[in-house]
Design a protein with these regions (language model features):
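A short coil-to-beta-strand element that immediately follows conserved catalytic motifs
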Residues: 31, 180-184, 235-239, 281-285, ...
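N-terminal Rossmann-like NAD(P) cofactor-binding subdomain of oxidoreductases
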Residues: 1-209, 213-215, 303-307, 341, ...
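C-terminal substrate-binding/catalytic lobe of Rossmann-fold NAD(P)-dependent dehydrogenases
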Residues: 216-284
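C-terminal active-site/capping subdomain that shapes the small-molecule cofactor and substrate pocket
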Residues: 253-352
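Conserved active-site and cofactor/substrate-binding residues in soluble primary-metabolism enzymes
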Residues: 14, 138, 160-167, 215-223, ...
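Short beta-strand or tight-loop elements
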Residues: 139, 236, 298-300
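Predominant activation on well-ordered alpha-helical scaffold segments within soluble catalytic domains
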Residues: 20, 166-173, 221-225, 269, ...
Length: 352
């Protein structure tokens, strides 16, 4: 396959940096532009020194300054890690210009802007007007493992919490073994709060600390409900309590439900293994998943437990990779007809 130019919008954030890292190791995508208005002209390596060997003196590009460098009638892999509320309008502008030049663009948006089917649903959760409501029908949103294929050119990646929870919840709801009400605890690392320190999210507050926030009111909850129903066919009530953990990367989610009849851990595990038998990035484990087994990789670990009528499914992912940049790369591989694992086979370091 001829190399495909790849562009990252919002390239100075943590997810943007992970996308740059993954593109650098990809066999078929070549970085054409790392877009950041605030740092245009600065070397990528100034913001991300660890990417210096891959990016060299490559500068960040300003919005609108890079598209002329993409040859007419060529393909384009467009990744957006731009902020919620800004991503949609940026994507719409680029796609309009690309279409005029015959550029065949596929888009994967990691922001929330295209996770909902209609503008009103998005605006109810995130506030403000949607930046490109005319494009909502052109996007599909799903965890890669929960949608076998799509005929759309553009994909919205679910949020990091949503990804971790859906990997556990969707097969559980599909199994028919449990009532359609889920009780969910999720613990996330500090990178999930972005690069800008805030009173409750930066290191001195989180180190040696653990606390819940937005209990039963997190904005990923309606997203989880919607995507779980789409993937499983079951509308479930989701009671979600997120927590801030004292670590940088990773999400550990625990999903509990009540069994509707007699069921064993073995039956549950067999169902999950069948459901994810063709999913190279999902591993069903004995006992509990562990963050160190997945951090810095695109892997997800899932563990299952059962006692009486209580069923528990646990999942662990890297919030920046499987929950964002890696999942986005999975989707982009599929949109371009590449092996799903291309550029994503690096093993987790284990000792971080």
């Amino acid at each position: 396959m001829t190399s495909v130019p790849a562009v990252v919008l919002g390239a100075t954030g943590y997810v943007g940096g992970e996308l740059l890292r993954l593109i650098a190791a990809h066999p078929h995508f070549d970085l054409a532009a790392a877009v950041s208005e605030s740092r245009a002209g600065e070397p990528v390596s100034k913001t991300f020194p660890h990417l210096g060997a891959a990016c060299g003196d490559t500068p960040f590009a300003a919005h609108g300054a890079w598209l002329d460098g993409i040859p007419a009638n060529s393909p384009l892999a467009l990744f957006s890690a731009a902020p919620h509320g800004a991503s949609a309008a940026m994507i719409a502008n680029i796609l309009e210009q690309a279409q005029a030049r015959g550029i065949a663009a596929h888009t994967v948006d990691v922001s929330a802007d295209f996770r909902y089917r209609d503008a009103a649903a998005y605006e109810a959760v995130y506030g403000g007007s949607h930046g490109a409501p005319q494009l909502l029908g052109d996007f599909v949103c799903a965890v890669p493992e929960h949608l076998a294929g799509t005929d759309t050119q553009h994909v919205a990646h679910p949020g990091c919490f949503a990804t971790a929870i859906l990997l556990a919840a969707v097969p559980l709801l599909q199994s028919g073994f449990v009532a359609p009400e889920l009780f969910v605890t999720g613990i996330t690392g500090s990178t999930g709060s972005g690069r800008t320190p805030q009173a409750g999210t930066h290191h001195p507050e989180r180190h040696s600390n653990l606390y819940a926030y937005k209990a039963l009111d997190h904005r990923h909850t309606p997203e989880i409900v919607n995507l779980a129903e789409t993937a499983s066919g079951t509308h479930a009530r989701v009671n979600f309590v997120p927590h801030s953990g004292p670590f940088a990367r990773g999400i550990f989610a625990t999903v509990q439900a009540k069994a509707t009849g007699k069921v064993s851990t073995g039956q549950l595990r067999e169902f999950f293994e069948s459901r994810y038998s063709d999913s190279p990035f999902v591993r069903i484990v004995d006992g509990s998943p562990k963050l160190k087994n997945v951090v810095a990789s695109n892997m997800a670990e899932i563990g299952i437990a059962q006692s009486g009528d209580t069923v528990v499914v646990m999942s662990a992912i890297d919030n920046l990779v499987k929950g964002a940049a890696g999942g986005a790369m999975q989707w982009m591989n599929r949109l371009f007809g590449q092996p799903e694992t291309a550029g994503l086979t690096a093993l987790p370091p284990g000792w971080t």
